[in-house]
UniProtKB/Swiss-Prot annotation:
It is found in: Cytoplasm; Early endosome membrane. The gene is ZFYVE9. Coiled coil: none annotated. Zn(2+) 2 binds at C721, C724, C750, C753. Residues 230-245, 296-312 have a biased composition (Polar residues). The lineage of its organism: Eukaryota, Metazoa, Chordata, Craniata, Vertebrata. GO terms for molecular function: 1-phosphatidylinositol binding; protein domain specific binding; zinc ion binding. GO terms for biological process: endocytosis; endosomal transport; transforming growth factor beta receptor signaling pathway. This is Zinc finger FYVE domain-containing protein 9.
Length: 1425
């Protein structure tokens, strides 16, 4: 395999070199210089230049090299009467008849006409559907920063349609209006994005009669209908249009009485690249005789190239005729919204508010090239002009759009001559006027569409145009998850080169990236496997299958009806790792699409009117202006504006300006609120980032960091982000994330991708609760809030009577009906909105107070428009109960820190019902102080986040009035609980909430694996508790101190003692000295547990101390090694250094690191001693030795804090050894021979005795004993098993950080600890010591996966701490699981059996001798960010 990748790397480099040489010969230097510049620094307001359009002429390239154009469409026609339209506008339902999807596939461009004539029936073609004067036209909306090929498709409509229902037009969850869904089309070089979309109007009638009917004489009573486009089934293929043809329906009459374009047919236009790199575009025309049209029709003029007209503050739509029209346009431009054009209504229909919000660009997809000689020369910009613009554009890439426009105006006559030439050439080929299905295409072909000018003759008003946000459309054949779909992506017969696969993909991604701010949204209804479309045809299984394939992350194979395409599809294999991903020559890697905020950080913001935020195209910038005129009229309810996922958008933009919780700044990157704004179960806002291997930017093309732009040098190295493939410096690419395509292994990612991935993970966890089953404890979840009639219509059972929903009185609980609380209170919530007693919180009450109901509550956009996606209606905005605004749709309480800046965190108040609490938001300092001063038996409980509580009480501790802060929830992240006793200040009237913030910081650190233990520390980075001199906390365990009247958590726990900044070096280097010094200061043994603010520091400058020789006070590179459990006992003429036998390895490490002439080590606090040495620094900076002891107890054993053996004593000195007390430790001077003997004894784990005194003395002065004693069992004090309450004291345990963690239904189950209850160390039970780790990991993973479906129910039942005891013995293999001292209920055991039994039996096979009994501890948490 390595040889294969090496060969592939060599071949790829060779191909790249040859390609660059060919480029040098055939492409101008300008293109070569800017090739990677488009990747490294793409212009944010212009399109990437397309070198494939360098020469556009009439010659045709070989058919084999021409890419195929695949148009996917699913047309739905809905004939509506005027009454039905009004009914729909008022929030009711109207019908929608989905048509069977058709698609054309043509493998040979030459034989296209013959294939169309021979192989396709009337129903298989793209039909031109004409409607009456009341029809609304279509407007294709193009993103202003994408190379786009627009293909507007009109479909025929026959009576063989499946019956379905159009849901409420104003229902924001409705996905039935699939107007203008974009299907991506690819050409070979993939430098132009091609997508087709249209909103088609047709009537449900026989198409044969429709062919014969004069399109201008249709009855006016016909209701308007909308054909909604969505991807077709892979098994029903139609409408393949050859890319070498540009068909244009050029017969447009002029009828002053008709203001709407009566017919529009778009066939295909594509710019294709031949084998020689020169594109050939051939334009054909489907001619419709003038006899079919009555009168003359005004031809609207599409003008391309107005500079900056795509910006919100720019020209937008230019009007050249009526002053009234000009004022209308100016109004729309001031409001920052594109103008909705509406035809004249001769019968006086009151549809005058037809305004929609859409993207920045307006391109009418109903454009008919007038073939008559009577049309004005300067008012028509035909497709030939478009091609001419393409020619000039490709000849000079530096030419701006404004220059292009001017150049086209100058060459207008030449353009029309060329157009006539094209029309004459293409006219004989396709003159079937009876086919009824012609298509007209507009080739964007790399042009930077910066403006759209629409004008018409004096006799006509503007045509009706419906705008659709282009940002909601997917380009390049990607679904809403960014995955390439084989049914949409084009696979050329001539496979692309590797250079195409590697480099041009990156160019496409960068040129598109500006327009992707809104495409990463929800996939829609989860019932259709997360597809982005709500299938309107309930009986068409093939369509469902295709929708599933289209939105799936793994490209699926097309159906049997397209065997040729199936044969040409390459197999997708995603490589990863290496400097440049190796890939087959026919594979195009999928580019991870970042979020908009990812792009905001990635590229500098634009200046001027070219605003960076793509969501600003929805008109949020100036939504407040002219909002009354911009709101869509109710009469347009049947022509709703929907995005890719079928969500209705029109009322959102209309009302967002009036909703304070949604009023975001126009340049805010947080404007990407599309999915959550409608209460729909949104998916994570990005997809392929980290899921597929990115295309790496070559080192040679990245001289600077792509974030901070620091230049790379010999010392400043390049680092590739494993998620996006870009090149960054070490500081910008220093984080790590688990990437899916690397089997969830941690890899280096840039800070931008890290933020995106973390947000997306939180998004995914947050939204996972929306697909839960109803809670059996609450019947309200089984009752729908959708009116019965709408349910019937939505299910298609219109002919059957509406269902009757009967609920017994009193079954549904409504907290709002309870007695009013005397003050503002809230229910305790979980992230999914379930109360501890299983009741679902009432939405109205919760939203009023800031909590969320079950699932994801949506924001109600209008009091009269119910949001049916929420289990209960929401009537007010959702704001975080701490006062800050959270992201719309996110569960309240999911933030890491719920402490407001200007107040206190929420308080839990017991309601008297077991398991039920009320939540008081922003309690006042006065009321809190009053309750605390009253001194009730129970403490106040503050909510710091959904998993962390803090209990507060004022206590009297050792005759001191103190605040007592206690945490609850630290155990779940592997951290001991924290207790802080803070002495109250005189007349203190405010609760010191800095303690809360520090608790949250400790929780964050513990999540990252950084926990504090006994004699550990945490420091402050800023002023704390009103003083910058407060340096941090020193954490100690309680020994001899009094714990009376304190609020204590479940063991284990630590006490935090406030220390000063001058004391922080000792907390880092030698914390036991600081602890004992505090005890000496306050005359408490061994130290006080309370903290005193603004006290004098106990240590100053380090000065002259022996510790300067043993530890590094300057850089903290080394400290005095401390062996856990080692103590020093000092008695009369006897000093004992006791080393626990189970700390042999630690002792060896300390000895091996020490100098050969010096052996030193720190000691632990000796609980068996009744006194201890203390080092005190006086005012002169000198260190003195004192001793503290237990009050009223005689001193027998005195402890010391360290020992030092020095081998510098010479035998000529006359001493065997010398011992002395230095500061708070013992120093022993021995000879070099004795030092060697001591080290050898320690290695052999033997006791060693040193005799001190003169060599000729009759009696020795003192003995120094180095002893190996029993194992250190001073662990797990007070810990009991959650399975059966068994004490876990003295049992060895291991904390687990970054271990197994699984998320489901808004909950997280974490494996935090493992105890080894029985393990015979002398007998190696497992074949390898690492087997312990592997076995426990496998068991933990199986346990978590088995309980994931039950996490919600377990937490509701109070079983948040779970234990799993596994026994592996020769005669017994099994497990026990329990919580709260009881075994788990039987309902969970079946899943555990199937998951654990295979793993445990597999581990039992590794046994050799002796039993293994281990207990794993798990916690169930809320998923917080």
């Amino acid at each position: 395999m390595e040889n294969y990748f090496q060969a592939e790397a060599y071949n790829l480099d060779k191909v790249l070199d040859e390609f660059e040489q060919n480029e040098d010969e055939t492409v101008s230097s300008t293109l070569l210089d800017t090739k990677w510049n488009k990747i490294l620094d793409p212009p944010s307001h212009r399109l990437s230049f397309n070198p494939t359009l360098a020469s556009v002429n009439e010659s045709a390239v070989s058919n084999e090299s021409q890419p195929q154009l695949k148009v996917f469409s699913l047309a739905h026609s809905a004939p509506l009467t005027t009454e039905e339209e009004d009914h729909c506008a008022n929030g009711q339902d109207c019908n929608l008849n989905p048509e069977i999807a058709t698609m054309w596939i043509d493998e040979n461009a030459v034989a296209e006409d013959q294939l169309i004539k021979r192989n396709y029936s009337w129903d298989d073609q793209c039909s031109a559907v004409e409607v009456g004067e009341k029809k609304c036209g279509n407007l294709a909306c193009l993103p202003d920063e994408k190379n786009v090929l627009v293909v507007a498709v009109m479909h025929n409509c026959d009576k063989r349609t499946l019956q379905n229902d159009l849901q409420d037009c104003n229902n924001y969850n409705s996905q039935s209006l699939m107007d203008a869904f974009s299907c991506s089309l690819d050409n070979e070089n993939r430098q132009t994005d091609q997508f087709s979309f249209s909103i088609n109007e047709s009537t449900e009638k026989d198409m044969n009669s429709e062919k014969q009917m004069d399109p201008l004489n249709r009855p006016k009573t016909e209701g308007r209908s909308v054909n909604h486009l969505c991807p077709t089934s892979s098994d029903s293929l139609a409408s393949v249009c050859s890319p070498s043809q540009l068909k244009d329906d050029g017969s447009i009459g002029r009828d002053p009485s008709m203001s709407a374009i009566t017919s529009l047919t778009v066939d295909s236009v594509i710019s294709s690249q031949g084998t020689d790199g020169c594109p050939a575009v051939k334009k054909q025309e489907n001619y419709i005789p003038d006899e079919d049209l009555t009168g003359k029709i005004s031809s609207p003029r599409t003008d391309l190239g107005s500079p900056n007209s795509f910006s919100h503050m720019s020209e937008g739509i230019l009007m050249k005729k009526e002053p009234a029209e000009e004022s209308t346009t100016e109004e729309s431009l001031r409001s920052g919204l594109p103008l909705l054009l509406k035809p004249d209504m001769p019968n006086g229909s009151g549809r005058n508010n037809d305004c929609e919000r859409c993207s920045d660009c307006l391109v009418p997809n109903e454009v008919r090239a007038d073939e008559n000689e009577g049309y004005e020369h300067e008012e028509t910009l035909g497709t030939t002009e478009f091609l001419n613009m393409t020619e000039h554009f490709s000849e000079s890439q530096d030419m701006t759009n404004w220059k292009l426009t001017k150049l086209n105006e100058m060459n207008d006559s030449q353009v029309n001559e060329e157009k006539e030439k094209f029309l004459q050439i293409s006219q004989p080929e396709d003159t079937n006027g009876d086919s009824g299905g012609q298509c007209v295409g507009l080739a964007d072909a790399g042009l930077d569409l910066k403006g759209t000018c629409i004008s018409e003759s004096e006799e006509c008003d503007f045509s009706t145009v419906i705008d659709t946000p282009a940002a909601n459309y997917l380009s390049n054949g990607c679904d809403s998850y960014g995955m390439q779909d084989p049914g949409v992506s084009f696979v050329p017969k001539t496979l692309p080169s590797k250079e195409d696969s590697v480099t041009e993909e990156k160019e496409i991604e960068e040129s598109k990236s500006e327009c992707y701010s809104n495409i990463y949204e929800q996939r829609g209804n989860e019932a259709t496997e997360g597809s982005g479309l709500l299938l309107n045809s309930t009986g068409d299984l093939m369509k469902k299958n295709y929708l599933h394939n289209f939105c799936s992350q793994v490209p699926s194979v097309l159906g049997q009806s397209s065997p040729k395409v199936v044969a040409s599809l390459p197999s997708i294999s995603v490589p990863f790792g290496g400097a440049r991903p190796k890939q087959p020559s026919n594979l195009k890697l999928q580019i991870p699409k970042p979020l908009s905020d990812h792009l905001q950080n990635d590229f500098p913001a634009n200046s001027g009117n070219n605003t960076k935020n793509k969501n600003d195209i929805l008109g949020k910038a100036k939504l407040g202006e002219n909002s009354a005129t911009n709101v869509c009229s109710p009469s347009l309810g049947n022509i709703s504006n929907v995005d890719t996922n079928g969500e209705h958008l029109e009322s959102y933009e209309a009302e967002i300006s009036t909703r304070p919780c949604l009023a975001l700044a126009p340049d805010s990157p947080d404007n990407d609120l599309r999915a959550g704004q409608f209460g729909i179960s949104a998916r994570k806002p990005f997809t392929t980032l980290g899921e597929v291997a990115p295309v790496w930017v070559p080192d040679s093309q990245a001289p600077n960091c792509m974030k901070c732009e620091a230049r790379f040098t010999f010392t400043k190295r390049r680092h590739h982000c494993r998620a996006c493939g870009k090149v960054f410096c070490a500081s910008c690419c220093s984080l790590k994330c688990k990437l899916l395509y690397m089997d969830r292994k941690e890899a280096r990612v840039c800070v931008i991708c890290h933020s995106v991935l973390m947000n997306a993970q939180a998004w995914e966890n947050m939204m996972s609760a929306s697909s839960q089953s109803p809670n059996p404890n609450n019947p309200a979840e089984y009752c729908s809030t959708i009116p019965p009639l709408q349910q019937a219509q939505a299910s298609g059972a219109l002919s059957s009577p509406p269902p009757t929903v009967m609920v017994p009185v009193g079954v549904l609980k409504h907290p709002g009906a309870e007695v009013a609380q005397p003050r503002e209170q809230r229910r305790v919530w979980f992230a999914d909105g379930i109360l501890p007693n299983g009741e679902v919180a009432d939405a109205a009450k919760l939203t009023m107070n800031g909590t969320s109901s079950a699932g994801t509550l949506a924001v109600s956009h209008d009091p009269v428009k119910p949001v049916t996606t929420s289990p209960l209606p929401a009537e007010t905005d959702i704001c975080l109960f701490s006062g800050s605004i959270t992201q719309v749709g996110s569960p309240v309480g999911s933030a890491m820190n719920l402490i407001p800046e200007d107040g206190l965190p929420p308080i839990l108040i017991s309601t008297g019902v077991k398991g039920d609490y009320a939540v008081e938001e922003k309690p006042s300092q006065i009321s809190v102080m009053q309750q605390l001063e009253d001194g009730g038996p129970d403490p106040l409980v503050f909510v710091l986040n959904a998993n962390l509580l803090s209990m507060v009480k004022i206590v009297n501790y050792v005759n001191r009035k103190c605040w007592c802060f206690t945490t609850k929830g630290m155990h779940a992240v592997g951290q001991s609980e924290i207790v802080i006793l803070l002495q109250c200040l005189p007349d203190e009237k405010c609760l010191p909430k800095d303690i809360f913030n520090h608790f949250v910081q400790l929780y964050r650190d513990a999540l990252a694996g950084n926990v504090v233990s006994n004699l550990g520390h945490s420091f402050f980075s800023q002023s704390f508790l009103g003083s910058k001199e407060h340096g941090g906390f020193l954490y100690v365990t309680s020994t001899y101190q009094s714990l009376q009247d304190l609020v204590l958590p479940t063991p284990p726990y630590l006490f935090g003692i406030l220390i000063q900044k001058w004391e922080t070096p000792w907390a880092k280097v030698f914390p036991i000295r600081l602890m004992l010094r505090l005890g000496a200061e306050y005359r408490l043994y061994p130290c006080p547990l309370f903290s005193v603010r603004f006290r004098k520091p106990l240590f100053g400058e380090t000065g002259h101390t022996i510790m300067n020789l043993l530890a590094d006070f300057r850089n903290y590179q080394y400290t005095l090694p401390v062996v856990q459990g080692l103590v020093v006992d000092m008695e009369v003429r006897k000093t004992s250094i006791k080393i626990p036998s189970n700390r042999y390895n630690e002792m060896m490490k300390a000895m091996n690191k020490s100098n050969e002439h010096v052996l030193a080590g720190g000691a632990c606090f000796n609980e068996k001693a009744d006194s201890h040495l203390v080092c005190v620094q006086n005012d002169d900076g000198n260190y003195q030795t004192q001793a503290i002891s237990i009050h009223n107890q005689p001193r027998k054993v005195t402890g010391a804090s360290f020992f030092v053996f020095s081998g510098a004593l010479k035998s000529s000195s006359g001493y065997l050894a010398k011992s002395s007390i230095v500061e708070d430790g013992v120093m022993v001077q021995i000879t070099a021979e004795n030092m060697d003997s001591l080290r050898q004894a320690l290695r052999e784990m033997k006791d060693f005795t040193i005799t001190c005194g003169k060599a000729d003395a009759e009696e020795p002065q003192e003995h120094i004993h180095i002893q190996w004693v029993d194992d250190d069992k001073n662990v797990s004090k007070g810990v009991v098993s959650p399975i059966d309450g068994k004490s876990m004291e003295t049992i060895t345990n291991v904390k687990i950080f970054h271990g197994s963690e699984y998320k489901a239904n808004g909950k997280v189950i974490r494996w935090t600890e493992v105890f080894f209850l029985e393990n015979d160390d002398q007998h190696n039970c497992l074949s390898d010591p690492a087997d312990h780790s592997r076995l426990t990991e496998h068991v933990a993973k199986a346990f978590c996966l088995a309980l994931c479906p039950h996490l919600k129910l377990l937490k509701e039942d109070g079983m948040t701490k779970l234990g799993l005891r596994v026994t592996l013995d020769s005669d017994q293999v099994g497990y026990q699981a329990g919580s709260n001292g009881q075994p788990l209920p039987s309902q969970y055991m079946n899943d555990l059996d199937s998951a654990l039994v295979p793993v445990i039996h597999g581990g039992a096979c590794q046994l050799s001798e002796g039993p293994v009994v281990m207990e794993l501890i798990f916690y169930i948490l809320e998923n917080i960010v």
